[in-house]
Amino acid sequence: MGKTLFDKLWNRHVIYGKEGEPQLLYVDLHLIHEVTSPQAFEGLRMENRPLRRPDKTFATMDHNVPTEDIFNIQDLVAKKQIEALQTNCEEFGVTLADMGSDRQGIVHMVGPETGLTQPGKVIVCGDSHTATHGAFGAIGFGIGSSEVEHVFATQTIWQQKPKSMGIEINGNLPKGVYAKDIILHLIATYGVAFGTGYAVEYYGETIRNMSMEERMTICNMAIEGGAKMGMMAPDETTFEYVRGREYAPADMDKAISDWKTLQTDPDAEYDLHIKMDASILEPYVTWGTNPEMGVPFSKAFPEIKDMNYERAYEYMGLKPGQTAEEIELGYVFIGSCTNARLSDLEEAARIVKGNKVKNNIRALVVPGSRQVRNAAESIGLDKIFIEAGFEWREPGCSMCLGMNPDQVPDGVHCASTSNRNFEGRQGKGARTHLVSPAMAAAAAINGHFIDIRKEAVISGGN
């Protein structure tokens, strides 16, 4: 029987262990940031251990970075964590994309941009959304601080092999529907736990037609459907994205020859298989307190089916039967490792251009990396957003999570391009609605959610 992409990647990296039991995997790339690494570095220090492969470790600042002025860090804990990463990287010989560096940004954007993320690798990071890197034909998954220390010391990690799931996606995306809507649809349809215990491969006509940035959006949110890993087979789109980047292989032809073997064999079988027609999708909006609680724009919010729904409606200040258009928005956030890439900002700017943010909205655009910010400014996107009334910020995780000054006030609804809408995720009492960048941009200039498939409803002015 043939092998799936996941089987091939996994088997390449097993150092020790029997089938059915936890196995020791070799780690090709360890990405770190300021929040989950300090304890791990201290553990090495206490045991007088070296960091085994500093050349396979790369650090950046993202979670705690204040995006209004990256050097004006008021929070003492954040300042201490950032300073600790600077000290630790210098002591242990780790390459650091420091504050103000041309490579600084959200860790899951910096890896691909620099060419560190490549097909065939096992990539780990002390962050839930490491599955983003699976878009390149790699295994990427998040780990805890104790596991970060283990990788520091050994360049390996113990893992139980998950089962395999294949999600086949075919059909052309309708106008106004994006990669973000695909993953929100999957989670709303099958639930936040459907991928638990699985490594998911997304494939099919729709995936093949996507850019790498779109593919990363889908893999980024694999964890929100319960899967530890999400991945896609590499192809010419992948190879051309990696080619010429700072850490791309010196012999690209040789690398590509190997990467082309990273495909699921025709006779391979997944443990679970799902088929999806992308051509019938609508823009999605979440109404509740996890990504499963979402609806197509044309649908009303569902009836209460259990205590979780009851609690979600209470927290969000909404009721069954309402529609997304009725939500009284106060904030719009375009950013995060899900949707802060150049193509995301270009699509948002296309909608924003010539319009103004409504008076009831505070709108932020936060490029996910310095590279994206520089590229956006080189083509004038910053001017489009600023003229429309958006705040144009420095790169960082920003309003995706309440660990820096960018937070949504208590009780306020926010249209957000991020990946999680948990209670308090964007600040105490914040009410988060997950959407695509286009939906967020249109909401900012209309003051509420609209059906972006109908261009006539995109208005401007205050």
From Swiss-Prot:
Pathway: Amino-acid biosynthesis; L-leucine biosynthesis; L-leucine from 3-methyl-2-oxobutanoate: step 2/4. The keyword Transferase does not apply. One of its GO terms (biological process) is L-leucine biosynthetic process. The keyword Iron-sulfur applies. It is an enzyme of class 4 (lyase). Its cofactor is [4Fe-4S] cluster. [4Fe-4S] cluster binds at residues 337, 397, 400. Binds 1 [4Fe-4S] cluster per subunit. It catalyses: (2R,3S)-3-isopropylmalate = (2S)-2-isopropylmalate. Keywords: 4Fe-4S, Amino-acid biosynthesis, Branched-chain amino acid biosynthesis, Iron, Iron-sulfur, Leucine biosynthesis, Lyase, Metal-binding. GO terms for molecular function: 3-isopropylmalate dehydratase activity; 4 iron, 4 sulfur cluster binding; metal ion binding. Its EC number is 4.2.1.33. Catalyzes the isomerization between 2-isopropylmalate and 3-isopropylmalate, via the formation of 2-isopropylmaleate. Belongs to the aconitase/IPM isomerase family. LeuC type 1 subfamily. Heterodimer of LeuC and LeuD. HAMAP family: LeuC_type1. This is 3-isopropylmalate dehydratase large subunit. It comes from Listeria monocytogenes serotype 4b (strain CLIP80459). The lineage of its organism: Bacteria, Bacillati, Bacillota, Bacilli, Bacillales.
